[in-house]
Amino acid sequence: EPLRNLAVVKESIKVMLSSYGFHLSPTAITVSTLGLPKEMLSLSKELPEIQIALSLHAVNDELRSKMMPINTKYSIAQLIETLKVMETLRKGPVMISYLMFKGVNDHLEHAEALNTLFVERKVIFNLIPFNPTELVSSEYQVCSRDQIQNFKAIIENAGFRVTVRASFGGDIDAACGQLASISGK
């Protein structure tokens, strides 16, 4: 979680943006987070043009807490309240990352719930197909491309911008979410 080391992350971003660093555009930088409200607000205030991606992956606290234990500390409702404040500090929308698992969080009712949760919020949804790996056992399964497209259509029909992350490197266990050692650590 990069925001657990916020001071270093901020300084690194400033170097990447500077003329003595990489001279990147702020919109070329995305910081992904599990959702640490205080740190999200601090980052938004100090660097309002960079992209922030909130890893959500569920539409209710019960499921999100099972998938992401951090949710027991910061609920979905708290994160949405944080997003409301961030909108007053930031120049652009926050990305909501949503890793899709077959039969777990991919039901069309979940798409409708996302629409309800984020009504009137400035967000972009990034749907991420699950990439399994033989190195790490998982109870999760891959969603069909059709299911992801149907899910996407429901969110788009509510007026949100939605992307589906392209997956590369799956053939060598190097796609998003697949990086692990042979020991599974």
Predicted feature locations:
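Conserved AdoMet/S-adenosylmethionine-binding subsite of the radical SAM
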Residues: 1-154, 158
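A structural preference for short, hydrophobic beta-strand core positions in alpha/beta folds
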Residues: 127, 164-166
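Radical SAM enzyme core and accessory elements
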Residues: 157, 167-185
